[in-house]
Regions:
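Perimembrane helix-loop-helix junctions
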Residues: 24-58
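Aromatic-enriched
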Residues: 180-243
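Membrane-interface alpha helices of multi-pass inner-membrane proteins
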Residues: 3-29, 152-159
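Membrane-interface transmembrane helices that cradle and orient dolichyl/undecaprenyl
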Residues: 1-3, 38
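Aromatic-anchored segments of alpha-helical transmembrane domains
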Residues: 12, 60-68, 154-163, 191-204
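Helix-to-loop transition at the C-terminal end of transmembrane segments
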Residues: 66-84
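Aromatic/glycine/proline-enriched transmembrane-helix motif characteristic
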Residues: 44-51, 60, 64, 81-160, ...
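Membrane-interface catalytic loops of GT-C/OST-like multi-pass glycosylation enzymes that act
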Residues: 161-172, 203-212
C-alpha cells in the first residue's frame, strides 16, 4: 500500500503540471482492482469501487498538500488549458477543422472555422476518452498490461488531442517503450523523431520559411561535399573494404 500511495502521489503531482499525468492514476487503479479480484477473490464491482476510492483519496490529499505547501492554491487548474488557444497542424481534429473551414470559405459560405473547430475538437476528445475507457476496462479484465494500456490510450489521445506539439508523443512513447518490443515500434519512433527534427526547429524558433529552406539546403550541400570528399579519398587510397 505504501508503494501504491507513493505512485498515486507522483502521478498526482505530474497531473498538476500536465493534466495528462492523471491518466496514470486510472490504470494503476485498474491494476490494483485486478489484484484484488485475482488474489483476494473480491467481486469486480467492489474491487473497482475500492480502487477508485483509494486513488481519489490520494489525489485529493496530494492536491491539498502541494497547494498548501507551495502557496499557489489551485492556480495550476487555470493554467492547464493555455496550449488549447493555438492551432496546431499536428493535431488531427484541428487540421480537419481548419481544412473544412478553409474549403467553406472557398465555396463562399463564410468563415466558420471557429465553430467547426469546436465540433471537430470535441469529437476528437470524445473518441479519445471512449478509447481510454475501453483500455481501462481491458486492463481490469486482464486483457492488456496496465503499462501497455496506458501507452496505447495516450497514443490515441495524442492523435485526437486539440493541440499537439512534437514532444507530446512522449506521453505514449515512454510507457510503450516498456511494453512494446517489436521492431515496427522502434522503427516508427525513430522515423517520427527524425522527421520532427526537421519539421520543428530547436527551442520552437518561428523562422521564416525561406530561412528554414536555406538552412536545410546548406546542410544538404555540406553533407554532399563531405560525402564526395570521403568517396574520393577512399578510392585514391585503394581501400576496398572497411573493417
Amino acid at each position: 500500500y505504501l508503494a501504491l500511495a507513493a505512485s498515486g502521489f507522483c502521478l498526482s503531482c505530474a497531473g498538476m503540471v500536465k493534466v495528462t499525468g492523471f491518466i496514470g492514476l486510472g490504470f494503476v487503479g485498474m491494476a490494483y482492482a485486478r489484484y484484488l479480484i485475482e488474489k483476494n477473490g473480491t467481486p469486480r464491482w467492489k474491487a473497482l469501487a475500492c480502487a477508485i476510492a483509494l486513488q481519489l483519496v490520494v489525489l485529493v490529499a496530494t492536491v491539498a498538500l502541494i497547494s498548501a505547501c507551495t502557496g499557489i492554491g489551485l492556480g495550476w487548474v487555470t493554467g492547464q488549458g493555455g496550449a488549447a488557444s493555438i492551432r496546431s497542424w499536428l493535431s488531427t481534429s484541428t487540421a480537419v477543422g481548419v481544412g473544412t473551414g478553409f474549403f467553406g470559405m472557398l465555396l463562399g459560405l463564410g468563415d466558420h472555422t471557429e465553430a467547426i473547430l469546436t465540433v471537430t475538437r470535441t469529437f476528437g476528445v470524445l473518441v479519445a476518452v471512449a478509447f481510454m475507457a475501453r483500455m481501462l476496462f481491458a486492463t481490469l479484465r486482464g486483457r492488456i498490461h496496465p503499462v501497455g494500456g496506458l501507452g496505447t490510450a495516450s497514443l490515441v489521445l495524442v492523435i485526437f488531442f486539440p493541440v499537439v506539439h512534437p514532444w507530446y508523443i512522449l506521453w505514449a512513447v515512454l510507457p510503450l517503450a516498456a511494453w512494446a518490443n517489436r521492431l515496427i515500434f522502434r522503427f516508427s519512433v525513430v522515423a517520427y523523431s527524425a522527421a520532427m527534427s526537421f519539421f520543428v526547429l530547436p527551442r520552437g524558433l518561428g523562422l521564416p520559411p525561406s530561412t528554414i529552406i536555406a538552412i536545410y539546403v546548406s546542410a544538404a550541400c555540406a553533407y554532399a561535399v563531405i560525402a564526395a570528399l570521403w568517396w574520393v579519398a577512399v578510392h585514391r587510397s585503394g581501400i576496398r573494404v572497411l573493417d
